[in-house]
A protein has these predicted regions:
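Alpha-helical cap/lid subdomain in secreted, periplasmic
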Residues: 37, 66-82, 91-195
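Serine-esterase "nucleophile elbow" of acetyl-processing enzymes
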Residues: 16-89, 99-108
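Boundary at the C-terminal end of the N-terminal hydrophobic targeting segment
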Residues: 11-15
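C-terminal segment of classical bacterial N-terminal signal peptides
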Residues: 2-10
Length: 195
């Protein structure tokens, strides 16, 4: 205890630097908007791998789906929006496509945020096969009346070390345009932070 009492105390605590504000992303989400306008519970499914699951988050309450749930509750008082976490560590397009019907469509969401490509990059997935799988999945979701936002890769050493990381991000952008899905580019956001 004497050691603690005699330790020097900084005159003023330093606050952590803040990230610059994220650029505004305009998304067309007619099914989600219709549910909210009608006063119905809106359901968002976060589909993906460990980034979605929250593998490296300090606790489950800090996974991005949990934070999204909290922020939506604060931003939309009076409306109920449920965000369901369907992230499974190590998965990518083949595994996520295989469980689309049971894990996603079955809960009848208005919106799916599909984080895909990081594990594919580390596995050196063929970009054309990746394109086919993601396109098939997005079309299946849209046919079920679900809005889709694709989420690309975050910058991290294991993904950045592969040429597939950039290629699969490019494919996601192309698929989003081709099929009319939204795109949330974590890569572009992180590049903005670096400037």
């Amino acid at each position: 205890m004497a050691l603690t009492a005699s330790a020097p105390v900084p005159a003023r605590a330093q606050s952590a630097p803040e990230c610059p504000p994220a650029p505004l992303i305009r998304l067309h989400l007619p099914h989600l908007q219709a549910a909210l306008t009608a006063g119905k519970e809106a359901v968002i499914v976060a589909l993906g791998s460990s980034s979605t699951r929250g593998e490296k988050a300090s606790d489950p309450a800090h996974s991005y789906p949990a934070v999204l749930q909290t922020r939506l509750a604060q931003a939309l008082p009076g409306w109920h929006v449920a965000v369901l976490n369907r992230g499974i560590n190590g998965q990518d397009a083949p595994e996520e496509l295989a469980r689309l019907s049971a894990d996603v469509i079955a809960v009848r969401p208005q919106l799916v945020i599909w984080q895909v490509g990081a594990n594919g990059a580390m596995r050196k997935s063929d970009p054309e096969r990746f394109r086919q799988r993601v396109t098939e999945g997005v079309r299946e979701l849209q046919a079920a009346g679900i809005d889709v936002v694709l989420m690309d890769n975050q910058h991290c050493p294991r993904v950045d070390a592969t040429p597939e990381g950039v290629l699969l991000d490019q494919v996601l952008g192309q698929v989003a345009k081709q099929v009319g899905a939204g795109l949330f580019s974590r890569a572009a956001l992180m590049e903005t932070w670096q400037r």
